[in-house]
Amino acid sequence: MGYLVEFDKMLWNEPAKGMRTKAFVSGKQQLILLEFSDGFIEPDWCQKGHAGYVLEGEFSIDYNGIIERYKKGDIIFIPSGEESKHKAILGKGEKATLLLFEIIDP
């Protein structure tokens, strides 16, 4: 078993227009390379917990009406649960790439 995660050898998945992902899963943990682009707004509130690093670009997250802006180099920690529900928001022409770390719920 190797310890190198080679995202460059993985194919992109596109779960929604303006959102692409590559995921590496090991047991109950996963790493996700996530790319948002061009006016993407998540249609539903996410209640998953995430820890992540913004690799490129800028974007906003709506935390139930409170908007926070993130840029390249920022680290994000979002606890799971209703009180931390959130949606990613990108303006027209914006693009952002993130590396997310998640624990997979049973």
Can you say where each PLM-predicted feature lies in the sequence?
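A short, N-terminal "cap"/entry segment at the start of jelly-roll beta-barrel domains
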Residues: 1-28, 32-33
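Short loop/turn positions at the edges of beta-strands in beta-sheet-rich folds
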Residues: 25-28, 55, 80-82, 92
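Short strand-coil-strand connectors
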Residues: 27, 62-66
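Conserved short histidine dyad/triad with adjacent acidic residue
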Residues: 30-46, 80-81
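Short, conserved beta-strand element in jelly-roll/cupin
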Residues: 36, 45-61
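Short acidic-glycine-tyrosine-enriched beta hairpin
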Residues: 65-81
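Ligand-binding loop in jelly-roll beta-barrel domains
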Residues: 80-106
